[in-house]
């Protein structure tokens, strides 16, 4: 069985609710496994990290977990280097427009302002597993550099005790300072607490499996690090009408299924004809493009859906409830339809904007909130690595004019003896 078609309305809760709840899994069981690993790395440092690296990554741990990028000279295919440089340039140019201005305003004669200051040290997690992700290194490091972060390290699992030159090249092009060859919960713990050989970071970003996510959530809850949004399985929701190309829509669904067996791929449409054609194209593509076929088939079977609503308005209502990581809008009036979007990690407009463009080269960030977190989180960006510091310079005249209000408020809160007095003595 491939992808299923459902004719639905917004009140069909038995069909829609399980999809809306998708990967909001209870992390408690994973946290129970992760906590002792994290605490062990905290207490025993490199020694514990070596044991877990050999156990979970099934490699002989490297002699040194840390690679200083300035000392490395990776050898990669010129075409790969050109692509990485181009992607980095586009990412940098897009994220430059996110750099906020420090601002001032005068209120009642007082100067008030906002000062943006960077986090001092950041680790960017680049997943291991079934694929290599030099693009994630670019996506994590470049916004941090633009924000002014001075100390940036990559944390990623070793492959056969070392790292591919492609990952090292990406780190060098992006401007990272070092690479920490450690993955999973143990790697997150190492860069959070620091070890004998690994510097600690104040903030950790980047996608990973449920153990990485659980470690980030646990350490954040302990106040050890700050994190970006907790990551779940990759997902795409496509809203399309009969102007969309069914083969292209099918390809975009399968590009998400290619990430993993738990990836989510959903089409919402008002056209039963398009739905049927997309289903046929998905089945055809699974035969014609067999690479990672078992993974794609399981993803599509378990987490792939085609919903046929009576109109596009219902498609957008459902999408905003779902709050997808990636939202594609392949409709006749896609620019107008963008205004209907309330919750999404990143939006891809028109027939010529597949998610893969944002994954690699267009310049938007691919580190995005998943599992409905787009309702409250944004994509990774420059602001992720900045703190907003407010300041004020109060005049003597303002003290005199505003003290009566301070007196009333401090008395109401029962704090006039010291709060009120600190203003009163300055009149």
Swiss-Prot record:
One of its GO terms (cellular component) is cytoplasm. NAD(+) binds at residues 125, 186, 209. One of its GO terms (molecular function) is zinc ion binding. Transmembrane segments: none annotated. Its EC number is 1.1.1.23. Binds 1 zinc ion per subunit. Zn(2+) binds at residues 256, 259, 359, 419. Pathway: Amino-acid biosynthesis; L-histidine biosynthesis; L-histidine from 5-phospho-alpha-D-ribose 1-diphosphate: step 9/9. InterPro entries: Ald_DH/histidinol_DH, Histidinol_DH_CS, Histidinol_DH_monofunct, Hstdl_DH. CDD domains: Histidinol_dh. The active site is at 325 (proton acceptor), 326 (proton acceptor). Catalyzes the sequential NAD-dependent oxidations of L-histidinol to L-histidinaldehyde and then to L-histidine. This is Histidinol dehydrogenase. It comes from Leptospira interrogans serogroup Icterohaemorrhagiae serovar Lai (strain 56601). The gene is hisD.
